[in-house]
């Protein structure tokens, strides 16, 4: 019994290649050869039937071409090949579009590539600020008590200009503008200065230049351009004793401008508004003396510290009593070791001892 006949069982399927018959019609589309399995599980013997040939080698004059007709070739396959082919025909390859199911449970500590996943926590953006500058300790500069300004002459040794307050002085028709401003300046120890004024003047008494030292009276209707003055106290708690003067600039109806220091009454021809500012310009002497004393004490302590530093830097070093070393040239014996014996009378050195 042949080996192939023994392996070919009645239950094994046979496969054959289906070929088209040439000349039987239009050529079919080119397709790859497919394997078809018989549904009836029939077995074909390994017999080779002779191929038939067309006796007329010339083509058909009617236009129908004939060719070789071959019967289907039996294909003997081993059980392993048949099982593999059956598995390939029944099982379809998985498509690439199928989504991978996510496994349940805690994710793996290590990734697919075998590398370890970093477990370090990254700082949150809200907690980390790009410009996180530490605030200095103590009170920020400029938030403490108001400091004194530099001295402005002998009349104002400690001017600060604190507590500036604006005021409005209303002068009725026929009243003296200059006397109103002066009386307002005597109401308290505060210094005043005129910021602006508006209205009309009927009579103005102005001072002449220095050589004559006289006054000139102007009568008519004059427009008030500007009014400037400042009244300051010369001494503390002495209200009437003030320094300052008034100056005015007027415009006549014909376009002329006159002005100068006020040496007499300045009568208002209409309602005049004068804007005045008052401020505290001086500090009591007691506070000044205390601050000066404290500043002098600080300067004295600084000077003492500087002197101590200078003396410490210039004073020669004090030799230590425990050591008495005398530098001598090489090859010369010195008697400096005797002083060591004098400092230590109880020391006994025996050179014979080993």
Curated annotation (Swiss-Prot):
Region (Disordered): 1-158, 290-354
GO molecular function: minor groove of adenine-thymine-rich DNA binding
Name of the protein in question: AT-hook motif nuclear-localized protein 11
Residues of the PPC domain: 159-302
Organism: Arabidopsis thaliana (Mouse-ear cress)
Composition bias, Low complexity: 46-55, 75-96, 122-133
Entry annotated with the keyword Nucleus: yes
Listed InterPro entries: AHL (IPR039605), AT_hook_DNA-bd_motif (IPR017956), PPC_dom (IPR005175)
Task performed by this protein: Transcription factor that specifically binds AT-rich DNA sequences related to the nuclear matrix attachment regions (MARs).
Composition bias type Polar residues, residue spans: 304-327
Pfam family, any one: PCC
Name of encoding gene: AHL11
Subcellular location field: Nucleus
Acidic residues: compositionally biased ranges: 294-303
Gene3D superfamilies per UniProt: Hypothetical protein, similar to alpha- acetolactate decarboxylase, domain 2 (3.30.1330.80)
Gene Ontology CC terms, in alphabetical order: nucleus
Basic and acidic residues: bias regions: 340-354
Lineage, uppermost ranks: Eukaryota, Viridiplantae, Streptophyta, Embryophyta, Tracheophyta
SMART domains: AT_hook
Comment, domains: The PPC domain mediates interactions between AHL proteins.
């Amino acid at each position: 019994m042949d080996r192939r006949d023994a392996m070919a069982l009645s239950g094994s399927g046979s496969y054959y290649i289906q070929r088209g018959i040439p000349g039987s019609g239009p050529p079919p589309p080119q397709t790859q050869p497919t394997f078809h399995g018989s549904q009836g599980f029939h077995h074909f013997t390994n017999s080779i039937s002779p191929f038939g040939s067309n006796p007329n080698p010339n083509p058909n004059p009617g236009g129908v071409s004939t060719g070789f007709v071959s019967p289907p070739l039996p294909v003997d396959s081993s059980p392993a090949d048949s099982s593999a082919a059956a598995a390939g025909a029944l099982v379809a390859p998985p498509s690439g579009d199928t989504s991978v199911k996510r496994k349940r449970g805690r994710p793996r500590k290590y990734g697919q590539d075998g590398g370890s996943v970093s477990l370090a926590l990254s700082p949150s953006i809200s907690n980390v600020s790009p410009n996180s500058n530490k605030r200095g300790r103590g009170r920020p500069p400029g938030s403490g008590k108001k400091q004194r300004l530099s001295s402005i002459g002998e009349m104002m040794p400690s001017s600060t200009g604190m507590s500036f307050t604006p005021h409005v002085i209303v002068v009725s028709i026929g009243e003296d503008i200059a006397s109103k401003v002066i009386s307002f300046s005597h109401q308290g120890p505060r210094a005043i200065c005129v910021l602006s004024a508006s209205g009309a003047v009927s009579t103005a008494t102005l001072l002449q230049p220095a050589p004559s030292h006289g006054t000139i009276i102007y009568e008519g209707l004059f427009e008030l351009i500007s009014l400037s003055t400042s009244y300051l106290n010369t001494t503390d708690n002495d209200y009437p004793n003030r320094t300052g003067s008034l100056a005015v600039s007027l415009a006549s109806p014909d376009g002329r401008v006159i002005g100068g220091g006020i040496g007499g009454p300045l009568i208002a021809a209409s309602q005049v508004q004068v804007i005045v500012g008052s401020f505290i310009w001086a500090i009591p002497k007691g506070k000044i003396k205390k601050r000066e004393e404290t500043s002098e004490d600080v300067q004295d302590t600084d000077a003492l510290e500087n002197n101590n530093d200078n003396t410490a830097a210039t004073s020669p070093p004090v030799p230590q009593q425990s050591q008495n070393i005398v530098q001598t040239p090489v090859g010369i014996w010195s008697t400096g070791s005797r002083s060591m014996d004098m400092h230590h009378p109880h020391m006994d050195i025996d050179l014979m001892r080993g």
